[in-house]
A protein has these predicted regions:
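Hydrophobic, well-ordered secondary-structure elements that form the walls
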Residues: 232, 268, 322
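Extended hydrophobic/aromatic segments used for targeting, binding, or gating
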Residues: 210, 223, 237-239, 255-256
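Membrane-helix and juxtamembrane interface regions of eukaryotic multi-pass membrane proteins
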Residues: 1-218, 244-248, 253-264, 272-313, ...
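Alpha-helical transmembrane segments and their membrane-interface exit regions
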Residues: 229-240
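Short, conserved phosphate/pyrophosphate- and ester-handling motifs at nucleotide-, phospho-/glycolipid
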Residues: 204, 268, 318
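Transmembrane alpha-helix entry/boundary detector in multi-pass membrane proteins
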Residues: 215-227
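Transmembrane helix-bundle signature of multi-pass membrane transporters/permeases
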Residues: 227-231, 260-265
Length: 361
């Protein structure tokens, strides 16, 4: 507190939550937390979080995932060659020939380095996604478990509307999630285009719009549920890719992909439609139409229609993607192994001399 008091006032929105307010008299969630209102200055903190994400992404990519993948893949190639040729003379060594020089038989070729480089880049990109979604989903589960709502019957998300005062964890959850999707949109436009660039960008635009609208229209409880459902399966797809890029036995990426497929189906095609149904029917039944920004009411026929149409649009896109996922599952069943058909796996079928392109899940 003393530190923040010494900073210029225009800096504070970039490093702290804006618009603190009184805790409700009888809070139904986070009774011991500081509460806040929504504020346009929240975008300042979102900008800071985007910058932090960019730094963390590169730090993990360059400092952890790339070195590990490069070491592991290089070691595997050398060990394979040792096992292939070492028995012929009984004294071959992957580490050297006794005079401080590497054994030429086991040195990496130019083609080896290109292949490793391609896998290392892809492994590192997926690593950031695994770290983010694992931590964010865990935080989202903590937030949602403290809200008086139920996944299978989210009717309570509408009771007590408008939920103007937000507990600090809820506000942090929303702003960090919004910052991540904005960061992903920047990455999508900065890197080589994938096959599904238009679909992914459309998905992110609709998602960001829904986050922003539910945040400022005081519909954060249903928003927390939707974000929690969306994030779970996104842990397992990049993890399956990482296991494949490390050339581990196919059973490991296949099992992980199967977990991804199961969680996708349950969260996005069973539980998410329940949230959509509640938005269409329960929201209209429990919240009267009223546009009164001073009291936090932003519910009109137009806004209600806009919300559920955007949610339905997300579900349609997810159904298209799930059809692609089923195709991949069929390849697993027929023994071809799991590959991601939702994105452009550049270089997978290219000659090793082809361009190496970064790819973000």
């Amino acid at each position: 507190m003393v530190f923040s008091q010494r900073l210029p006032e225009y800096i504070l929105p970039f490093i702290s939550l804006s618009s603190p307010t009184n805790t409700p008299a009888n809070p139904d969630s986070f009774p011991n937390s500081q509460h806040y209102r929504t504020d346009p200055k929240d975008l300042c903190l979102v900008i800071t979080i985007i910058a932090v994400y960019a730094i963390l992404r590169d730090a993990l990519r360059l400092g952890v995932f790339e070195p590990f993948a490069r070491w592991k893949l290089s070691r595997d190639i050398k060990l394979q060659r040792k096992q292939h040729t070492g028995t012929s003379n009984g004294n071959a060594s992957v580490f050297g020939n006794g005079n401080g020089n590497s054994n030429p038989k086991f040195m990496l070729t130019k083609a080896d380095r290109r292949k490793i480089h391609r896998s290392v880049l892809r492994f590192a990109e997926q690593g950031w996604s695994v770290v983010y979604y694992t931590l964010q989903w865990g935080f989202g589960l903590y937030v949602y478990s403290n809200l008086p709502t139920r996944v299978l019957d989210p009717v309570d998300a509408w009771i007590g509307y408008p939920h103007v005062a937000l507990a600090a964890p809820v506000k942090i959850y929303y702003l960090t999630e919004l910052a991540f999707y904005l960061h992903q949109m920047l990455i999508l436009n900065a890197e080589a285009r994938r096959k599904d660039h238009v679909q992914m960008m459309t998905h992110h635009i609709v998602t960001v719009f829904l986050m922003w609208a539910s945040y400022y229209y005081n519909l954060t409880r249903i928003g927390c549920l939707v974000m929690l459902l969306m994030d779970l399966c996104d842990i397992f797809l990049p993890l399956a890719k990482m296991l494949r890029y490390l050339n581990l036995p196919q059973i490991y990426p296949d099992l992980t992909f199967g977990t991804f497929m199961l969680t996708w189906f349950v969260t996005r095609h069973v539980l998410f439609p329940i949230a959509i149904k509640s938005t269409i029917f329960d929201m209209r039944r429990l919240i009267p139409f009223d546009w009164d920004p001073e009291r936090g009411y932003y519910h009109t026929l137009g806004s209600h229609t806009m919300f559920y149409l955007c949610l339905l649009a997300l579900e349609v896109m997810q159904m298209i993607w799930f059809a692609m996922i089923v195709r991949v599952a069929w390849k697993v069943v027929t023994g071809e192994g799991a590959t991601d058909v939702r994105s452009d796996e550049e270089g997978e079928d290219e000659d090793d001399s082809g361009d190496i392109k970064n790819k973000q899940e």
